[in-house]
């Protein structure tokens, strides 16, 4: 989506996000019911590092909500994409889908564009269906913002810590 369609879409999702009567739930479990170590600490660190750059303090629910809402307008990017997958496809197809998403991101980068994959959209599948044709046979997986990066934005300075290679790969001779 671009232009006016993107603006209408964003307004609709923001309205749904701020409607206490709206049913904003994902059709699938994106995250575990309860995070566990080491993933819990890693996720928190990235979150607090980002919020630190944005000047959002712990417990500042108003700024936290405002930042979350920026997801729904694709962080003001000029292009917003929604990705779906057939609901009967299993984990192997989801792995393929992840590789497809990565290829979209690599292709965009090769053209000087930046992307931001966004899980937040899965919770708004009902509202999304009001704006774009997503058949009942499909699940909304995620969204993705695309455009030229605004390097003056503090969030674009975030470089998350990475685990050392030896923590997640084994070389066998």
Model-derived features: positions:
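Acidic, surface-exposed loops and disordered segments
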Residues: 1-173
